[in-house]
């Protein structure tokens, strides 16, 4: 079975699949059309059409500019001239076996809630979340005493799939099951649209990974999230 025909094959290169598909409206594309990245404030991730093609790397370098930081996922060692700033082992989990369920306490979050969302993200560090990330999909939150204490939503949208992301709970409200309830609420929204859920997590975040596995997520692959600096052509 070819890579293209395997079920879920788009998840092998999810950022590219999203930017070349459902998230095309958020994409900035290289002049050769072989690399793309999310617009500023949306997500720091970039992608290559074919990570084995040197022309795609050159296209990404031209798109980002010399000496700029970019984040990629699941890619091989970059060509000479690229500096690796950070490498984070991760897991990619398939959520097709997870049962979605609407959450009565969940409220739909939008642009007006971004300041509170950013505050919660700063406190809990679930991963990259910018001023425009909320535009990528459905985000739900739970408030206590008028204060946002937990949230979860969608990020990458490869065709037929949606990534559950920004799952976080205020430290004072952990242990109440809020994360699991919000994940199921997002899964329900994803399934209602006819898509399947998946997610990424840092491999070292064993507590979160354990929660996801207990909910029915299954390990699909183990990508690496890599922060790179583009070649400094002026050097």
Predicted regions and their residues:
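N-terminal charged segments
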Residues: 1-78
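Conserved hydrophobic beta-strand within the GNAT/NAT acetyltransferase core sheet
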Residues: 164, 197-201
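Conserved acetyl-CoA-binding loop-helix of GNAT-fold acetyltransferases
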Residues: 55-60, 175-191, 209-214
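Short amphipathic alpha-helix that is part of the acyltransferase structural core
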Residues: 1-12, 96-127
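Conserved active-site alpha-helix within GNAT-family acetyltransferase domains
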Residues: 77-82, 180, 203-221, 229
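A conserved beta-strand-loop-helix scaffold within acyl/acetyltransferase catalytic domains
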Residues: 128-138, 142-170
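A short, internal acetyl-CoA/4′-phosphopantetheine-binding micro-motif in the GNAT/acyltransferase core
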Residues: 46-52, 167-174, 202
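Conserved catalytic-core motifs of GNAT/GCN5-like acyltransferases
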Residues: 83-95, 200, 218-232
């Amino acid at each position: 079975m070819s890579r293209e025909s395997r079920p879920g094959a788009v998840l092998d290169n999810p950022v590219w699949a999203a930017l070349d598909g459902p998230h095309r409206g958020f994409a900035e594309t290289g002049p050769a059309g072989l690399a793309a990245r999310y617009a500023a404030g949306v997500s720091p991730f970039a992608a290559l059409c074919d990570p084995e093609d040197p022309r795609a790397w050159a296209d990404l370098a031209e798109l980002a500019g010399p000496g700029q930081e970019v984040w990629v996922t699941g890619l091989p060692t970059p060509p000479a001239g690229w500096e690796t700033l950070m490498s984070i082992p991760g897991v990619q989990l398939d959520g097709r076996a997870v049962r979605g369920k609407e959450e009565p306490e969940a409220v739909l979050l939008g642009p007006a809630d971004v300041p509170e969302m950013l505050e919660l993200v700063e406190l809990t560090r679930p991963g990259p979340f910018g001023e425009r990330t909320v535009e990528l999909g459905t985000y739900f939150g739970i408030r206590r005493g008028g204060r946002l204490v937990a949230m979860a939503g969608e990020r990458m949208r490869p065709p037929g799939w949606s990534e559950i992301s920004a799952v976080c709970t205020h430290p004072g409200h952990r242990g109440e099951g809020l994360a699991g309830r919000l994940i199921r609420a997002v899964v329900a929204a994803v399934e209602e649209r006819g898509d399947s859920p998946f997610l990424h997590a840092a491999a070292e975040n064993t507590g979160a990974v354990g929660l996801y596995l207990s909910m029915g997520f299954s390990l699909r692959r183990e990508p690496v999230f890599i922060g790179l600096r583009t070649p400094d052509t002026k050097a």
